[in-house]
């Protein structure tokens, strides 16, 4: 929980889908996976497809929200990074099995699925300890 109401999400928000024109205007392309989803979907995918440190990822979450995240918000979005990473890792395994090379993303998604799941679970455990 903690993500708020569903909203329109791109669901494939990673660097190649962000274009910037000569005037500096940004465009988000490739909308075939778009739909109504938890707001964590897009930021989770964006971080999962980047090579950020944990601190950088937490900064991205704060920028996305427009404020310092509460403990509940942070664990929710960290959990979404883990889920998005796991989803894309499984997709990458399938692509590799079909002889389509995924590259370094496969390792990044594997690493992030484990790392961010652990971070989110630790935050849930901390809350239970103080409840």
Across the structure, where does each feature detected by a protein language model lie?
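Active-site activation/catalytic loop segments of kinase-like enzymes and analogous catalytic loops
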Residues: 40-69, 82-100, 119
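Start-of-helix signal in alpha-solenoid helical-repeat scaffolds, especially tetratricopeptide repeats
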Residues: 75, 79-83
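ATP/Mg2+ or Mg2+-diphosphate-binding catalytic cores
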Residues: 90-131
